[in-house]
From Swiss-Prot:
The lineage of its organism: Eukaryota, Metazoa, Chordata, Craniata, Vertebrata. This is GATOR2 complex protein WDR24. It is found in: Lysosome membrane. It comes from Gallus gallus (Chicken). It catalyses: S-ubiquitinyl-[E2 ubiquitin-conjugating enzyme]-L-cysteine + [acceptor protein]-L-lysine = [E2 ubiquitin-conjugating enzyme]-L-cysteine + N(6)-ubiquitinyl-[acceptor protein]-L-lysine. Zn(2+) 3 binds at C672, C675, H700, C702. The GATOR2 complex is negatively regulated by the upstream amino acid sensors CASTOR1 and SESN2, which sequester the GATOR2 complex in absence of amino acids. In the presence of abundant amino acids, GATOR2 is released from CASTOR1 and SESN2 and activated.
Length: 705
C-alpha cells in the first residue's frame, strides 16, 4: 500500500484523495463528485492501491479507480442510507455494506447489479463493520441497539456466534491483530472511553482506555501485526497513541458477587465457592438450590487475559407461590383508568378496583384524592364553619347563651382544665333551631343583610378574640371579660355588672382611648357568655387543594419507598399538573421507568405504551417517539421495495393493492390468513358485511373477526 495516499469524504458528497508525496504545496490528487448526499465511509482495497470504495446517504456505493476520473462501478443497495463499507481481507472480490435499516449486504465487485447476500443484523441502524484479519468468515457489526455482533459467513445463512452488550451506541469496531477473540469498540455518544472486549466474555471489557474527554470518532490498530498500539481520534481535538500495557482492567474493580430478583420474587445469589464454603455455620434455607457456575479470578497483566476458571456457586431462594403472586399487579394495571373521565370518576373507579383486590389502603388513598381535588359540585364536603342549620354555610345567628338555662346531658365536650390539670366535661346545647334567650332587640340582626364590615369591622376570627367562660367554678377568682365596642357594635343596652374589676374600669379613664372605645360590655363568667354572630362565613367552606399537596407528595414517596411504583405513577398521571411540580423531575422519571419496566416484564405492552403517552415527564414521553421505519417486499416478486415509490423496480407492479378499491394501501392493511388477499380495513369490513367471498375473486370464504 502507498503510505502517502489518503482519502477523505465530505458532507456534500465529494470524495477527495490526497498524495502527501507531491512536491507542490497542493497535495490534492483526485476529486469525485458523483454522490449527491453525505458520504459516510471511504475504504481502500487491502491489496489494490488504486481501488477506493465509498458509501453514501443516497443509498449508493461507488468503486473508484484512482487512475481514472470517474467511478468504475456503482452498487445500489435499494435500501436506506449506507453507513459503512469494508473490503474483506481474505476474499479479494468481496466487500460488506451496512445500512440505516439494520441490514447488512455482501457484494462481489464483479457483479454490481445485485448483492450476494443480505441479512438483518441489528434492531436499528448498523453504524460499522469489520472483517476478522485471520478468520475469513467472521464479520463484526455494531449498531444503535448498543450491541456488537460477530457473524459467521461461512454457513449458508449468516449465523450469530457472539454478541457483546455495551452501554451506548457503537460507532466503530476493530479486530485486534493476533488476538482472535479481541475486538476494540468506541461509542457514538455518552461514553468517551475505548473498550477492548473478549467476545467469549461479553459482560465486562478486558481493557479500557480513558484518555479522551469527548466522543471518540475513530480507532485503528497501528499495524496489521501489532496488537499493542492503538490510535484514536476524538472531538476533543486530540489524537492518542495508546499502549496496551497502560490500559485499565475493569475486572479489577468488578464485584465477584451477584444478587438479582426474578419477576415473581425468587432471589438468586452468586458468590465464590470459597466464600460460601468458609462459612461453616451456614444452614440451608428452604427453597435454596445450588448450581455450579464459573467466575474468573483477578487477572495478571502479563497473562494477556487468559481464562483461568474458579468455581463459584449460585443459590436460588424460591418464594412461596401464594406470597409471591403478582396477579394483583396485573389486574390493577389492566383495570385502572388513567384518563378520559373527570377526576372524581377516575378516583372512584380506581378506588373500587383497589378495594376489589383487597388493597384497602390504596383504595382509601384514591378516595381521599377525590375529596381533596374534586370540585364542590362532585363531592359533598363537611361544613368547615360548623354551621348548625341544614344546607347553611354561615354561622348560626345567636347572640348569647344563658348557661343556667342549658339542660345537662344534651351534649358534652371534654377539655383540659389548665388551672387544675384535670379533664372535665361541660355541657353545651348546640342547636341552631332553639332559642336559648328571648332577645327581641336582636331580632333585626337575624337573617339581616347588614354588611359584614358593619358587623365585624376588620376583625378576623382569631383565637385571641374568643373568650371561654368558667361556669363550673364560681369560687375562682372573679374576672370580668369585656368586648370593645369598636369591634362588635351593640344592638341593645347592656347593664354593667356590679362585680366588674376595678382595673378594667380604669381602662376607660386612659387618655389613649376615645369615649366610644371606652364603652365596654361586661359579662360575668358565672352568669352568661356572648357570641356575636355574622351573616357570612368566617372561612371558606373548603381548603384549597394546594394546601394538601405536601401531604399527597409524602404519600406518593411512601408508596414508592414501599416498592409500589404502580400507585405512585397512577396518581401522578391522574392528578397531572396538580401535583407534578411538588416532585422533582428525576424522581418522577425513576418512578416511570421502574413501572414501565415492570409492565414490559409482564408483557403488558399496550398499558406500557399508554403510560408513556400519558406521562407528565418529558424524558418518558420521548420513549415512543423514536422514528419507526417499515420495510416491505413486493407481493409479486418478493424483492425489497425501494424508497422511491410504491411500484416495484423489478416487476413494475404496485405493492399492497386493496382487493376492493385496487389502490395501494399506505396505512393499515388487513388480509385473510386463508387466501392472503386483503386491503384497506374499512373497505374489507364493508365488503364482508354483504358477502362472505373474497373480494379478489379467488372463491375463498373469508371471515372478519
Amino acid at each position: 500500500m502507498d503510505e502517502n495516499l489518503l482519502a477523505t469524504a465530505a458532507t456534500n458528497g465529494v470524495v477527495v484523495t490526497w498524495n502527501l508525496g507531491k512536491p507542490s504545496r497542493n497535495k490534492q490528487d483526485q476529486l469525485f463528485t458523483e454522490h449527491k448526499r453525505t458520504v459516510n465511509k471511504v475504504c481502500f482495497h487491502p491489496t489494490e492501491v488504486y481501488m477506493l470504495l465509498s458509501g453514501s446517504q443516497d443509498g449508493y456505493m461507488k468503486c473508484f479507480d484512482l487512475r481514472k476520473k470517474d467511478s468504475v462501478s456503482t452498487f445500489s443497495g435499494q435500501s436506506e442510507s449506507v453507513r459503512d463499507v469494508q473490503f474483506s481481507i481474505r476474499d479479494y472480490f468481496t466487500f460488506a455494506a451496512t445500512f440505516e435499516n439494520g441490514n447488512v449486504q455482501l457484494w462481489d465487485i464483479r457483479r454490481p447489479d445485485r448483492y450476494e447476500r443480505m441479512f438483518t443484523a441489528h434492531n436499528g441502524p448498523v453504524f460499522c463493520c469489520d472483517w476478522h484479519p485471520e478468520d475469513r468468515g467472521w464479520l463484526a457489526t455494531g449498531g444503535r441497539d448498543k450491541m456488537v455482533k460477530v457473524w459467521d459467513m461461512n454457513t449458508t445463512r449468516a449465523k450469530e456466534i457472539y454478541c457483546v452488550q455495551t452501554i451506548a451506541s457503537v460507532a466503530r469496531v476493530k479486530w485486534r491483530p493476533e488476538c482472535k477473540h479481541h475486538i476494540a469498540t468506541c461509542s457514538m455518544m455518552v461514553d468517551h472511553n475505548i473498550y477492548v472486549w473478549d467476545v467469549r466474555r461479553p459482560f465486562i471489557p478486558s481493557a479500557m482506555f480513558e484518555e479522551h474527554k469527548d466522543v471518540t470518532t475513530g480507532i485503528v490498530w497501528r499495524h496489521l501485526h501489532d496488537p499493542y498500539f492503538l490510535l484514536s481520534g476524538s472531538k476533543d481535538s486530540t489524537l492518542y497513541q495508546h499502549i496496551f500495557k497502560d490500559a485499565s482492567q475493569p475486572i479489577d474493580r468488578a464485584n465477584p458477587e451477584g444478587l438479582c430478583y426474578s419477576l415473581y420474587g425468587d432471589l438468586a445469589f452468586a458468590a465464590k465457592e470459597s466464600l460460601i464454603s468458609s462459612d461453616s455455620n451456614r444452614k440451608p434455607y428452604i427453597g435454596d438450590r445450588r448450581h455450579p457456575i464459573f467466575f474468573k479470578r483477578k487477572l495478571d497483566p502479563t497473562e494477556q487475559f487468559e481464562y483461568i476458571s474458579s468455581s463459584s456457586a449460585l443459590s436460588v431462594f424460591e418464594t412461596d407461590v401464594e406470597s409471591g403472586s403478582m396477579d394483583w399487579f396485573v389486574h390493577t394495571a389492566k383495570q385502572y383508568a388513567l384518563a378520559g373521565r373527570p377526576l372524581a370518576e377516575l378516583c372512584d373507579h380506581n378506588a373500587k378496583v383497589a378495594k376489589g383486590l383487597d388493597r384497602n389502603q390504596v383504595a382509601q388513598t384514591w378516595t381521599m384524592l377525590r375529596i381533596i381535588y374534586s370540585s364542590l359540585g362532585t363531592v359533598s364536603s363537611t361544613n368547615l364553619n360548623h354551621s348548625m342549620g341544614k344546607g347553611s354555610t354561615t354561622l348560626p345567628l345567636m347572640n348569647s347563651f344563658n348557661l343556667k338555662d342549658i339542660p345537662s346531658g344534651l351534649g358534652s365536650e371534654s377539655r383540659l382544665d389548665r388551672s387544675k390539670g384535670e379533664s372535665r366535661t361541660e355541657n353545651i346545647l348546640m342547636d341552631s333551631s332553639s332559642t336559648l334567650i328571648n332577645n327581641e332587640d336582636n331580632e333585626e340582626t337575624e337573617g339581616s343583610d347588614v354588611p359584614a364590615d358593619y358587623l365585624l369591622g376588620d376583625v378576623e376570627a382569631d383565637e385571641d378574640d374568643l373568650y371561654m367562660m368558667d361556669h363550673e367554678n364560681p369560687h375562682a377568682e372573679e374576672q370580668e371579660y369585656s368586648l370593645p365596642q369598636e369591634a362588635f357594635p351593640l344592638r341593645h343596652e347592656i347593664v354593667d355588672n356590679p362585680s366588674a374589676l376595678d382595673h378594667l374600669q380604669d381602662k376607660a379613664d386612659s387618655p389613649h382611648v376615645s369615649g366610644n372605645e371606652a364603652e365596654t360590655v361586661s359579662l360575668t363568667p358565672v352568669e352568661s357568655f356572648s357570641l356575636i354572630s355574622i351573616s357570612h362565613s368566617l372561612y371558606e367552606n373548603r381548603l384549597p387543594s394546594d394546601f394538601f399537596n405536601p401531604i399527597v407528595r409524602d404519600t406518593l414517596l411512601f408508596y414508592a419507598e414501599q416498592g409500589d411504583v404502580q400507585t405512585a405513577v397512577s396518581v401522578l398521571i391522574v392528578l397531572g399538573d396538580r401535583i407534578r411540580k411538588e416532585i422533582d423531575e428525576q424522581t418522577q422519571e425513576h418512578w416511570y421507568t421502574s413501572y414501565i419496566d415492570l409492565l414490559q416484564r409482564f408483557q403488558l405492552w399496550n398499558i406500557s405504551n399508554e403510560v408513556i403517552k400519558l406521562s407528565t415527564c418529558r424524558a418518558i414521553n420521548c420513549l415512543n417517539q423514536a422514528s419507526t421505519t417499515l420495510h416491505i417486499n413486493c407481493s409479486n416478486c418478493k424483492r425489497p421495495m425501494s424508497n422511491r415509490g410504491w411500484i416495484c423496480d423489478r416487476c413494475r407492479q404496485c405493492a399492497s393493492m386493496c382487493a376492493v378499491c385496487h389502490h395501494v394501501v399506505k396505512g393499515l392493511f388487513v388480509w385473510c390468513q386463508g387466501c392472503s388477499h386483503g386491503g384497506h380495513l374499512q373497505h374489507i369490513m364493508k365488503w364482508l358485511e354483504t358477502s362472505s367471498h373474497c373480494p379478489a375473486g379467488c372463491g375463498h370464504l373469508c371471515e372478519y373477526t
